[in-house]
């Protein structure tokens, strides 16, 4: 029996259970912008990704997609570009994609749990980390790492899932209502996310956070070329379909 019937999880979380399609959503620089991601989320390809746990025999099913904004690096010392990352200790949660990206930047991946990240930044265990903008601010990371570089390496794709156990107890009408509510929520998230993020970014800028814009993503993409090919070559055709959905 399960204690939770539904959850909102990062799409990447499913890769621990063998969901390889979901992994593609977390590859650096897959989505050029939000419109690119929503083209995917609203496409005929999205249900294939959402249904992957079912195909693998996992006891959960995907309902809809959302996103929590692009993820950016933030550091204790000011950085103005990619060259400044050489030798930095950057916090990772120990997934191979993130490790490979950090190594590609010339930095060293350092595993620290999220709960310990604030003190790790404060005490110099790590020199920086990465999060979506809203998480960066709400966890008070600017207090200890006041430099935010808007590289936007990945878009934080999230999805709602429901257990087979809970789904099986619903009538067909109730199941249809949940899927309909999911579609509405997905559309609401698309409208809300960017507006909310821009507001937080303005607050950060006006409170003295050193926000660095990245006008040219090419050097970043180049630095990630190895980790991108290593993690997409087994699904090259599917990955290309994702890339081709750009707005």
Regions found by a protein language model. Give the residues of each.
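N-terminal secretory/targeting leader peptides
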Residues: 1-36, 45, 51-247
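Short beta-strand-centered segments that line the small-molecule binding cleft or hinge
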Residues: 39
């Amino acid at each position: 029996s399960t204690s939770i019937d539904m959850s909102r999880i990062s799409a990447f979380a499913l890769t621990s259970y063998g969901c390889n399609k979901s992994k593609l959503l977390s590859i650096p620089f897959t989505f050029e912008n939000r419109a690119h991601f929503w083209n995917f989320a609203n496409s005929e390809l999205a249900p294939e990704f959402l249904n992957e746990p079912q195909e693998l025999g996992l006891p959960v099913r995907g309902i809809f997609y959302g996103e929590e904004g692009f993820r950016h690096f933030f550091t204790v010392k000011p950085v103005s570009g990619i060259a400044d990352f050489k030798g930095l200790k950057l916090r990772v949660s120990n997934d191979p994609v993130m490790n490979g990206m950090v190594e590609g930047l010339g930095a060293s991946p350092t595993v620290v749990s999220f709960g310990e990240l604030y003190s790790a930044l404060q005490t110099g265990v790590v020199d920086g980390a990465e999060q979506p903008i809203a998480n960066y601010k709400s966890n008070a990371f600017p207090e200890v790492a006041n430099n935010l570089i808007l590289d936007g390496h990945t878009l934080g794709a999230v999805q709602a899932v429901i257990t087979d156990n809970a789904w099986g107890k619903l009538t067909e009408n109730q199941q249809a209502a949940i899927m309909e509510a999911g579609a509405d929520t997905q559309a609401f998230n698309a409208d809300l996310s960017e507006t909310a993020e821009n507001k937080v970014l303005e607050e950060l800028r006006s409170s003295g956070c050193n926000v660095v814009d990245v006008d040219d993503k090419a050097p970043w993409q180049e630095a990630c070329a190895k980790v991108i090919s290593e993690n997409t070559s087994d699904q090259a055709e599917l990955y290309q379909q994702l890339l081709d959905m750009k707005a």
